[in-house]
Amino acid sequence: NSIFYILKYPFNKVHSLRLTLKGRYETNVVGALNDNTLQQPDTRHLWAGVKLEYIYDSSKQLYINLWRGSKVKLFAEYEQRAERDTRNLLVLGFDARRSFKLYRNMTFAVRAAASTNVGSARLVYFMGGVDNWINAKFDRTIWVDQSKDYAYQTLATNMRGFRQNIRNGTSFALLSGELRIPFVQLIAGHQVGVEFFNSMQLNLFGDIGTAWTGITPYSEDNCLYTRYIDSGPIHAMIRRQVDPFVGGFGLGLRVSIFGYLLRFDYAWGVEDLKIADKKGMFLFSLGTDF
């Protein structure tokens, strides 16, 4: 159960501050996998937190999923468990977006985002896929650093062409670009009378980014460079060389049906400057793009 109190203070039409006070009561239930776990009691914890955001928004809506202008958010968030222990979390980050109107309602949008966190109850970012991905797939072959005391997890998107968890860690950085072409409107020279056709968009996109543990993506303590192999009596640790940054590119179709914007994407992932899977990957998701 959670409770929030949000205070907004606008300086003018485009600048504002937002303060969020929150409390959360959580119950952790151990899965009854055997007799031992069946007897373990549930644990309950109370968390308190505060989030401060600076918002800049000069955007103007052109049509569904099409806009021009700038959007920027800087944020800091702190959470503390309201008990005798000292489990806490501090998250810092930003999200900056800019969309340029090219011709009629055709736009080119870019997004840069990054975040990191410190504390005794860490947040792990799983990079890969898109927001609101239907039938999402998770890559369980990528190792997660077990030396961190993770209390939360979230996705770092977009990274089209890969499953979730192509990269993970306590920090992430991401850059995306999209050319959005409302081709029906462009062919007709104006908006037609049917929203289904008006909303049709061809998207050409590209993503690049990484998630990591350690100070930088190239730090030796980045868990990306370590692999553990357990095979019977053999236990081995392997250090490997791999580029921490991955990318993706492809094309997609956007269309609105019954008020829902459907996103169909086909993407190819790039790792170590090579296409990871020449067959590519199909992604179906809901909602607007960034």
Model-derived segments and spans:
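Gram-negative/organellar outer-membrane beta-barrel architecture
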Residues: 1-63, 71, 151-157, 165-166, ...
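A short, hydrophobic secondary-structure junction motif
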Residues: 2-7, 77-82, 200-216, 247-258, ...
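Hydrophobic, well-ordered secondary-structure elements that form the walls
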Residues: 7, 96, 112, 177, ...
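Extended amphipathic secondary-structure runs
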Residues: 11, 169-186, 248-253, 259-265
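A cross-taxa feature marking solvent-exposed loop/turn segments within ectodomains of secreted
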Residues: 14, 103-105, 259
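C-terminal outer-membrane beta-barrel translocator/porin domains of Gram-negative envelope proteins
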Residues: 38-205, 212-215, 219-235, 239
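C-terminal beta-signal and terminal closure region of outer-membrane beta-barrel proteins
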Residues: 137-144, 216-290
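Short coil/turn motifs at secondary-structure junctions
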Residues: 182, 209, 269-271
